[in-house]
Structures are given as C-alpha cells and as structure tokens.
C-alpha cells in the first residue's frame, strides 16, 4: 500500500488492519486483475451483433439485469478482445449520482464470449485463478462501496461522475487462503439467503 494522504483516507473508510490473521496477505486490484475498457458501436467492418452490458443493467442490489440488454453492431476485432468471461467483474467507471457514487460493481456469471460491456464500464479480470475467487473479490469491493469509500475515488463534470482509475486500482485487498475465501463467501451468501427469506415473509 502506498502511504499518502489518499491512502490514509481510504484506509479510514475500508478499515486499516495493522496485523492480519496468519496466512493472509495484502496486494492491490491492479496487481490482482487486468483492467479492460468497454466498447460501443463499431465504425469499421466487419461487425458482429452482440449484447452490451450497460450501467442500466446494474440492479440496486448489485446484480445483472438481463431484461433490457442493448444489442448493437461492434467491430469484430474489438469484440474478440473485449467479450465477457465467466467470473469477470464489471465496474461502472462513468455515471453514478450524488446519492449513489460511481464504482458500482457486478459479477458476471454467464457464458463466456457472448456479451460485451459498454464504454461507460470496465472489466476487472483476475490474472491468476489460484490467487483469489471472483466471488470473494466481488463481495470485497461491494463492502468497500457500501462503506462510502468510492466517494474518494470520483470526479464530477457536468453532472457525470467519473471513477479515478489510478485510485481505484490502488485499493488494498486483503487475501486469505482459497479455502478461507470460500468459507467467507458461503457465510455471506447464507446470511443473504436468510435475509431474503425474512423479507419474503413480511
């Protein structure tokens, strides 16, 4: 972690751990993931007609809404480099609002090579699957967002909020073993399932 004023502010928002449990380590998003920019309508043939995930497909509970995906013609050569893979994290890099900062992140769990993602988003793709689980990283970033840390990572121009990528990609990530990650993910999802059951019964 780079110790500067920005990092200190982020540490206050997401929690600064002076000593991690045995077996944990700390790295950053940019070391863990490739970051890939999105695309939009193509200008040079050949084209391919594909569905493109947009900010509008992000639900309030940070899931992917497939009901209104927009299909457009994109350049085939660009799509070959920017199609979604199962386990990708789609990050809103432009958009947001005063009440909802930019930086919302959803986990793509669909078929690989079918959809792409818009130029208002980007993808985090884990470099080494034996390092971190995509679901663990998804819940990790979600927790950071819910704590309000993304407000320190955005600029605003004419009502549009933009993610400061260098700051976002410098987020420290605390990583346990894969087995511990799986235990944490299972526990989180068990709690969410219980909450859903309670809400449905009201």
Residue ranges and their predicted role:
Residues 114-122, 150, 154-175:
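A short glycine-rich beta-alpha junction/loop motif
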Residues 1-7:
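Extended, domain-scale alpha-helical bundle/helix-rich regions
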Residues 133-140, 180, 187:
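Short amphipathic alpha-helical coupling segments at ligand-binding clamshell hinges
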């Amino acid at each position: 972690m780079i110790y500067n004023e920005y990092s200190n502010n982020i540490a206050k928002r997401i929690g600064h751990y002076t000593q991690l449990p045995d077996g944990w380590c700390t790295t950053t998003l940019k070391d863990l993931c490739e970051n890939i920019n999105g695309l939009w309508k193509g200008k040079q043939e050949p084209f391919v007609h594909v569905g493109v995930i947009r900010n509008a497909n992000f639900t309030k509970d940070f899931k992917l809404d497939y009901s209104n995906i927009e299909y457009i013609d994109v350049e085939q050569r660009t799509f070959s480099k920017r199609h979604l893979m199962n386990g990708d994290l789609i990050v809103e890099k432009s958009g947001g609002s005063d009440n909802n900062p930019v930086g919302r992140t959803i986990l793509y769990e669909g078929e690989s090579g079918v959809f792409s993602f818009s130029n208002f988003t980007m993808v985090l793709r884990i470099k080494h699957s034996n390092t971190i689980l995509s679901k663990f990283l998804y819940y990790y970033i979600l927790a950071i967002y819910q704590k309000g840390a993304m407000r320190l990572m955005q600029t605003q121009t004419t009502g549009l909020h933009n993610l400061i990528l260098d700051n976002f990609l410098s987020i420290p990530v605390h990583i346990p073993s894969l087995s511990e990650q799986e235990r944490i993910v299972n526990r989180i999802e068990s709690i969410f399932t219980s909450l859903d059951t309670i809400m449905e019964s009201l």
